[in-house]
């Protein structure tokens, strides 16, 4: 985030600098007849990312912008996918993705009043080695797909997700919220990161394509997600 509060002023995020991204990935693809296999690995480092979170501070009783700079992140993982033919257009498909996404620095921050642009506090956000939020870092899929005559196709898939983390409140990971009476255990609990439970969904789809004069394609499809109505997601 380059601007602290783009809707009210033209101030840039303190400590803003060029964000740098370095990465490497490798893939191996194997195809033997209708059998398919793909294996991929990746590693990415991000340096000097900036981020602004806006919220109402109950203690200060004002709407604030929490501007962070110097955020470093690390991403690495492995992905494997395969497709195995079973019989006459029916195939078994599966994929697994495993990754580990972490913050690798303790960024600097400035908390600024939104209305007056007055700096309210500044310091360090202690979240090094915490997990990057909002995306599952482990995911699996297994399903059946069918391609039949007359351009008909159908599929059913079971999806599984795990290692999902809630977005952290960076203010709780600063010295500003600590009290002299707090014990080490209370501080660890305050700064701990919440992890979502694992989740799964079952989905299915069916469709048909029509080719018109070999120049145009008209397709119809129906897809149903979360067939089992799993609400623990």
Language-model segment annotations:
Residues 1-12, 53-66, 104-128, 170-189:
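Solvent-exposed loop segments that connect transmembrane elements
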Residues 13-17, 67-71, 129-131, 192-195:
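Outer-membrane beta-barrel domain signature
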Residues 15-66, 74-76:
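Membrane-embedded beta-barrel scaffold of Gram-negative outer-membrane proteins
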Residues 16, 26-30, 78-84, 94, ...:
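Residues on the lipid-exposed face of transmembrane beta-strands in outer-membrane beta-barrel proteins
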Residues 20-24, 31-33, 72-76, 134-140, ...:
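Residues that define the transmembrane beta-barrel architecture of outer-membrane proteins
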Residues 34-36, 87-89, 151, 211-218:
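Short loop/turn motifs that connect adjacent beta-strands in outer-membrane beta-barrel proteins
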Residues 42-45, 62-170:
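Gram-negative outer-membrane beta-barrel transporters
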Residues 46-47, 159-181, 197, 201, ...:
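C-terminal beta-signal and adjacent terminal beta-strands/loops
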